[in-house]
C-alpha cells in the first residue's frame, strides 16, 4: 500500500521512495540469504494516478538486478499498464488475487465465498501474461478460491467451473457434483450481502439434498460445513430481508466462529457476526 511522508524524496511513492528502499532491502536479503528471489509488489500503484508505473519502468530499465518478479493486481480489474505497455524491466509478471475480502464484511463471516466466475474474468484479463501468483488469503473460508488460483497457475487454459467440479468430486463426492456446482454458482450470484434473492432457497435445497449422499466424515468436515453454512445463512438472510436475527443465524455464526477458532478474536472484520 501507499507509504512515505509525501516529500520530494518519497513522492510519488511507487516511483521514488518505494523502489529506493526495496533495492536496499533486496541487497540486505541477498546478503543474508544467498539465492533468495525477490518479488516486487505494485499493489495500488497509480490509484489514483501518480506516474508510479512509468517511474518504476524507468528505474528498472536502468537496473533490474535487484528484483526477480513484478507482482501486480488490484481490488477490481487487473492493472492495464503491464498488459498494455509491458512489465517494467521485462520481468516475469505475477498476480495477487484478492480472494478473501472482496465484496463481503466481516471477511469469511458468512462461510465459504466461492468466486469462480469473477476469478475467470480476472484471469482472462491477464491475456496469458502471468507467470504465477500469490493469492491473498485471510482464512480457510476461501478454500475453493485458493484451489482455483492454484490450478490456473498449473494450467491457465482450464475453465474455473471445471476446476470447481473437480474440487467437489475430490473433497465431497462424485455423486453430488452437479447439484453442488449449481449451488456454488448461485452463492456467487448472491455474494453481495445487499442483493440476496430467492435463488438462495434453491442453493440451500441443493446443498441439503447433496448432504444425504455424503459420508458422515465428509458431512462433518470443515470444507463441507463452511459451504453448508454459507447456503443456510444466505437462505435465512433472504427470509429476514438482510437482518441478522433469529436462532438459525445465531447458531450458524457461532459454528463458523468455532470452525475458525475465532472465539477470542479482537474485532469484527475477522469474526463472524454475533447475534445476542
Regions found by a protein language model. Give the residues of each.
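C-terminal non-catalytic alpha-helical accessory regions
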Residues: 137-142, 157-276
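Catalytic-core regions of glycoside hydrolase
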Residues: 1-174, 261-265, 269-272
Amino acid at each position: 500500500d501507499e507509504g512515505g511522508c509525501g516529500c520530494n524524496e518519497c513522492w510519488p511513492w511507487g516511483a521514488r521512495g518505494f523502489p529506493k528502499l526495496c533495492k536496499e532491502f533486496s541487497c540486505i536479503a541477498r546478503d543474508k540469504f544467498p539465492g533468495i528471489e525477490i518479488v516486487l509488489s505494485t499493489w495500488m500503484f497509480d490509484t489514483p494516478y501518480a506516474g508510479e508505473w512509468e517511474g518504476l519502468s524507468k528505474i528498472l530499465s536502468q537496473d533490474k538486478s535487484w528484483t526477480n518478479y513484478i507482482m501486480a493486481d488490484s481490488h477490481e480489474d487487473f492493472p492495464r499498464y503491464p498488459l498494455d505497455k509491458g512489465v517494467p524491466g521485462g520481468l516475469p509478471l505475477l498476480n495477487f488475487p484478492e480472494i478473501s475480502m472482496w465484496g463481503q464484511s466481516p471477511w469469511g463471516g458468512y462461510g465459504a465465498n466461492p468466486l469462480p466466475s469473477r476469478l475467470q474474468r480476472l484471469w482472462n484479463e491477464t491475456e496469458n501474461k502471468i507467470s504465477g501468483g500469490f493469492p491473498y488469503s485471510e482464512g480457510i473460508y476461501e478454500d475453493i478460491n485458493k484451489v482455483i488460483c492454484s490450478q490456473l497457475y498449473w494450467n491457465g487454459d482450464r475453465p474455473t467451473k471445471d476446476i470447481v467440479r473437480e474440487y467437489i468430486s475430490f473433497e465431497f463426492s462424485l455423486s453430488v457434483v452437479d447439484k453442488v456446482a449449481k449451488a456454488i454458482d448461485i452463492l456467487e450470484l448472491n455474494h453481495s450481502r445487499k442483493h440476496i434473492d430467492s435463488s438462495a432457497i434453491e442453493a440451500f435445497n441443493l446443498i441439503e439434498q447433496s448432504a444425504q449422499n455424503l459420508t458422515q466424515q465428509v458431512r462433518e468436515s470443515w470444507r463441507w460445513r463452511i459451504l453448508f453454512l454459507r447456503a443456510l445463512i444466505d437462505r435465512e438472510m433472504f427470509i429476514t430481508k438482510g437482518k441478522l436475527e433469529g436462532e438459525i443465524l445465531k447458531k450458524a455464526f457461532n459454528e463458523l466462529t468455532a470452525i475458525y477458532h475465532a472465539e477470542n478474536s479482537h474485532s469484527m472484520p475477522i469474526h463472524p457476526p454475533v447475534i445476542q
